[in-house]
Structures are given as structure tokens and as C-alpha cells.
């Protein structure tokens, strides 16, 4: 019996890419591939790329350049580029880096087995179509092997919002929701493999409207169906748009015990002028009122957000509006970035903010966000939380997991196991984690 072929996947970017990489590995598993953590040992290398940040494509080309020596030493090595850079660049990747054998977009990776076979026949393989067929239906069921206690599950892809800074509608396409029965089937398969927490993924996940037994189902309806699965203890979802935060979803945060008290709800800016230029279709005031309604339903919920500073035409007054919004919301987590020009997006054509000024604003914003994060984490000391333990910590006998609020918690107890959920009393707060002891 011949040795299995080895597959090395490097994943960039969002949680959806992590999910996609898992499914690509499973698809190629049927071709005799097993995963390796070493590119040097691989028979196939796949870069699953992200196109959100500035110079994303150039970073991919630079990474590919590092494989030239490896390809020369192993002529049978196959190198592929997947994900959103593959979708955006297409055939240009092969032109600039002839060592690449395969380019596949995020809507076509269910075709990887036939594309891989094409490369083994000595041909180049390119597929960046938006096929009519459902890629999830074409993918086989999840393997039965045991896995960790948490998992991502994509329920929705694409976006119809067309924010002025974003390439997602161009690389992931229009909003598409998976039928509820297929999601529930996959969730059950994951639970059978030991998963106790599932995070539902979508570029605009709360716009979910997948087919259900009685017509389209909302995200809240899907969450309630997942709530019925024995063995599934926790549900999360990300990423959401404020305009799609429906009443039934807000209500679910207050009534569904398995839905964790954590919500990532990006706002991007606190200035109505900038929000309009971003094509966000909401105001700072409407966002703040939405936060009030969510907290009325679940008072202990921890909010998370995204911010872009230095957006074209942003003034100091606009930036102060963003700081004011952050002070009012007090995020437990927030991701902040300096605006980077994305060719092909409307914002790229507008007057740009001085880079030094944008850098200064980013530092000031991050200082406020960090202060709030530390205050919220310090406020956990003395409280009891529920922790799902995921893996051993750095110290002997230590286990690390996540609280319901997504805080990393480490506990010194040799009797704990991955997948166990326990009540923990928080005794100390650090920069990035909490220390606790079994309650």
C-alpha cells in the first residue's frame, strides 16, 4: 500500500477561511491526502488567502516566491492558491508565479478533487467561477474522527451591502444562505465528533434566510433548531450587520440559554458623515439604540466591534465622534484598522487622509479600546463563569478554555479534560486572559 500524499494548507484571514480550509482538506482526503504541518514534507501546498487588507495579493506573491527552491527540489510538488485573492487575481497568479499549478476561488473548492487530478496530469487548473450548484451539497459529509470541542460552521456567504471600503461582494459574491436541513445535518455530525460549541459563520450572518420546512428561516429560527441538538451546549455567530439585527434575534439573546452572551456587531465609525460615505446605511444614533435593545434583552452581554480610522475625508471631528461612540458602548473586544485603499472600491477614488494622521488616530482609538477591555476583564475577578476547556495550557496540569463571554480562562487542575464544561471562579485578570479555580 502506497504512503498517503501530504497536504499543507496555510490559512489567512477570517474564521470562514478556517472553515473552508477544513472542508478543502476533507475534499482532498478522498484523493488520498493527509494533512501535514510542514510545507517541506508536502506533496501539495495550498494557500487559502484573504483579500481584505492592503497589499493582500502582494503578500501572497511574496509567500509563493519562498516556495521556488522547494518546487525546484521536488518537481512533482503541486502548489495552489485558494480563497479571495485567487478569486480577485485569477489567471494573473499563474502568469506572475508560474510555479503555481492550481487557482481556485471560494465558491469552487468543492471541485478540488478534479482540479488536483488535472494538475497530476501535467495541466494547469483554474476555477474562479460562481457556479450555480451548491458547493456544500457537493462536499461529502464530515469525517467521523474525533476533533476538538469547538467548530466553525458556515451558514451564509457573500454580501449585498456594498460598503465603500469592502471587496467581499466582489470576491464572495451575492448573499446566499444554506438550507437549514443541511446545516442541522452538519451540526449533528460535528456533535457526534465531540464538538460542544458551534460558531455560525457568514459574511453577513444575521441576514441568513435559508430554506426551512415552512419557508425561509431566520437566523434566530436556525438557532432555536440548533438548540434542540443534544450534546451541543453553546452557540455563537459572526459577523453581523446592524441593519439585519432583527427583533427575533435580539429576543433569542435573552431567551436561548445555549446562545452565548457575546455579540460581534461592527459599526466601523461613529460619524454619520463617514458612515454615509462608507455606505453603511445606518447612523451612529441608530446603532447606539440597537445596542440598548440588545442589552435590555441580555444585560450581561459583551459587545465586540470593528473600526476603520483614516477613511477618506475623515476629519478630527469625525474621529472624535468615533471615540464618543466607543466610550458609550464600552466594547469587551474590538478590532481597529487604519483604512487601506482597495482598488475597485468606491472609497479608493476619494481624497485620502494623511497616513501619519491616520496612524495617530489608530493609536488613540486603540488606547481607549484597550482601557475598556482591561476594565471589563478586571471586573470579572470574583465572579463565577462557565468555561469550556479546549486544550492544555503552558504550565503542567493547566487547562485553557473560553468563558461564555469569550474570555480565555486558564485553570490549574490536572483532572480537567478538553471538552469539559465547568463553573470557574475568576481569581486574577491578565492582559489577554483570566486565571480561575474550579468553583
Curated annotation (Swiss-Prot):
SMART domains linked: Elp3
Pfam family, one: Radical_SAM
MTTase N-terminal domain residues: 5-121
Keyword Membrane recorded: no
Keyword Transferase appears in the UniProt entry: yes
Enzyme class at the top of the EC tree: transferase
Domain of life: Bacteria
Cofactor: how and how many bound: Binds 2 [4Fe-4S] clusters. One cluster is coordinated with 3 cysteines and an exchangeable S-adenosyl-L-methionine.
Principal location: cytoplasm
Binding annotation for [4Fe-4S] cluster 2: 159, 163, 166
Keywords of the record: 4Fe-4S, Cytoplasm, Iron, Iron-sulfur, Metal-binding, Plasmid, S-adenosyl-L-methionine, Transferase, tRNA processing
Signal peptide (from-to): none
HAMAP family: tRNA_metthiotr_MiaB
Family assignment from sequence similarity: Belongs to the methylthiotransferase family. MiaB subfamily.
PANTHER family in the cross-refs: CDK5 REGULATORY SUBUNIT-ASSOCIATED PROTEIN 1 (PTHR43020), MITOCHONDRIAL TRNA METHYLTHIOTRANSFERASE CDK5RAP1 (PTHR43020:SF2)
The protein's assembly and partners: Monomer.
Protein name: tRNA-2-methylthio-N(6)-dimethylallyladenosine synthase
